[in-house]
Design a protein with these regions (language model features):
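Long, contiguous alpha-helical bundle segments
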Residues: 2-181, 185-201
Length: 201
């Protein structure tokens, strides 16, 4: 029984040390003025990007009559699309440092995927290119904040960025554009909630 008690005590100490090691940077900065300014500025920026994505979703709906995900699930299975992961940005098991890394990587991935939307909607080039630029700028903001916190932020050269997905038919291209925007909207919603969570600490 004594050994069990000692083992549990040791586990508690190690767990506390692990949390201190990995949670301290953001926790200590939660009340920092510059960090809070970063959060609020990029909350507004993320909200603006979400609005632009929603505008393009309406264009896809009006132009191609692709409006409901449920009707397109079977086609989605055959599309060459990947969804960046944000599991560390949900409230349960939230890890700010890892979440920042996932947001940064995901934004870069969607910046490339939006190239397919640009090809799909040439008459809306200005809006799509603005969305790509804003996505790149938000990614850069996250990267800079990671560097300010002393966290690793690996940025591959521009020539190594993923090209937009290629589709085998015009219909696949249309459905692909629909899901790129729908998935990006969900990604941004999760990123927004994560930034808002940090702003409220």
């Amino acid at each position: 029984m004594c050994c069990l008690t000692q083992a549990l005590a040791l586990a508690a100490v190690l767990s506390a040390a692990w949390r201190a090691l990995h949670g301290a940077p953001v926790a200590e900065l939660s009340g920092d003025h510059d960090f809070q300014l970063f959060l609020h500025k990029n909350l507004e920026f993320t909200r603006k990007i979400r609005g632009d994505v929603a505008a393009l979703q309406r264009v896809v709906c009006d132009t191609f009559q692709l409006c409901a995900e449920e009707e397109l699930r079977l086609v989605q299975q055959d599309l060459p699309l990947t969804q960046p992961r944000l599991e560390q940005c949900h409230s349960r098991g939230f890890q700010a440092e890892v979440c920042f890394g996932q947001i940064h990587a995901g934004l870069r991935a969607y910046q490339g995927s939006l190239g397919a939307v640009l090809l799909l909607l040439p008459e809306h080039t200005a809006l799509v290119e603005t969305l790509q630029l804003d996505t790149a700028n938000l990614s850069s903001n996250i990267q800079q904040q990671m560097e300010d916190l002393g966290l690793d932020a690996v940025t591959p050269p521009a020539e190594q960025r993923s090209p937009p997905p290629a589709f085998s038919s015009r219909f696949q291209q249309q459905v692909g554009g629909f899901f790129i925007l729908a998935n990006f909207q969900r990604f941004l919603e999760t990123a927004y909630r994560a930034l808002r969570h940090l702003a409220r600490l």
